[in-house]
Amino acid sequence: MMPTQRLAEADPQIAKLIREETRRQAEGLELIASENFVSPAVLEALGSTLTNKYAEGYPGKRYYGGCEVVDQVEQLAIDRAKQLFGADHANVQPHAGSQANMAAYFALAKPGDTVLAMSLNFGGHLTHGSPVNFSGKLFKIVPYGLRQSDETIDMDEVARLAREHRPRILMVGASAYSRTLHFDRFAEIANEVGAAMVVDMAHIAGLVAAGLHPSPVPHSEIVTTTTHKTLRGPRGGMILCREAHAKTLNSQIFPGIQGGPLEHVIAAKAVAFGEALRPEFKEYQRRIVENAQVLAEGLKSAGLRLVSGGTDNHLMLVDLRPKKLTGKVAEEALGKAGITVNKNMIPWDPEKPMTTSGIRVGTPALSTRGMGPREMTLVAALIGRVLDAPADEQVLARVRGEVKDLCAHFPMYADRV
């Protein structure tokens, strides 16, 4: 017999922890650049009965019966994704960005082939060739990095390495890079050496959808993304590609990498894509960028050094070496003050990955709450105060109180706390 109790009755321990996490999100400043807050509609889809349905295969071609409804759900997600990004084909089944990237690699290359990608140490991602990741284990990775003069991507180096190594894939994208990615220039290099260009736009997908960052879709064989971050959907992945690659890519996801898709997550993706197709989403993305620029200037006014001097998108990297702080110390101190960031490697970082010399800061979540430039100036000052006295418990307590007061003016998930 099916249990009929609500969560609070059936499992009070988990219910309590969920309330505590919701309260943490509501009462603190969420500045992790890869995090965001989904809408109640997205949450509702995630918790729907679609979680019960197995649906191996694709709409109209399933290995299970009873898929007539989830076929419609998934097709809506596909159609909305294609409309949002102007793509020929979309696969909305990847459970995460890592699976999307794996499928892209497997569709275009064989193990042992050469991949030219941005080094994790300079802002890339684990799946762009880190030796501890499948990408670094299966492929020959040639990393590119930044110019020391301005801490932006060294396109001359990218071109030189491409000509020297003739990669099968040129992987473009980053997880900690605050400047515009010039996909047209990358495409010229890829075309010159006969490489297939793959773009991981996970961090900037929302900006791309709103036309605030150049789109990689016209220039790339394959584009991968997560569906959270700036896109403000559920945690998951997606692949966009030219029609010529559609069949191969689909087969790499299923049956190649995954089994049954998570149709409740796909429904939530469809809801988020629908939200992103509305005019107000563009205004939201404009606010993200404006907030990031104001926050960056505020942090510099507080005496902090930013990698590359600022930001063009939703995030910035703070170099803490002039403060004689590590990212680990800064993350912990800010956390005690109710400000959540993540420690992050900076270019040419002398510290280990679990220590780091920097922190990564982003504005998507605070922008979702409705905060604007005025609040960003205040947030920058609060961060500055904490980093000036990271071991002073009185300072941290005072800042935490101010953070809680600020958040109270921008309530979130009030019915769930």
Curated annotation (Swiss-Prot):
Cell compartments where the protein resides: Cytoplasm
Cystine bridges: none
Keywords for this protein: Amino-acid biosynthesis, Cytoplasm, One-carbon metabolism, Pyridoxal phosphate, Transferase
UniProt modified residues of type N6-(pyridoxal phosphate)lysine: K229
Entry's Gene Ontology molecular function annotations: glycine hydroxymethyltransferase activity; pyridoxal phosphate binding
Pfam family membership, one: SHMT
A GO cellular-component term linked to this record: cytosol
Site (Plays an important role in substrate specificity) location in chain: H228
Gene Ontology BP term (one): tetrahydrofolate interconversion
Cofactors that this protein relies on: pyridoxal 5'-phosphate
Family: Belongs to the SHMT family.
Protein name listed in UniProt: Serine hydroxymethyltransferase
Lineage: Bacteria, Pseudomonadati, Myxococcota, Myxococcia, Myxococcales
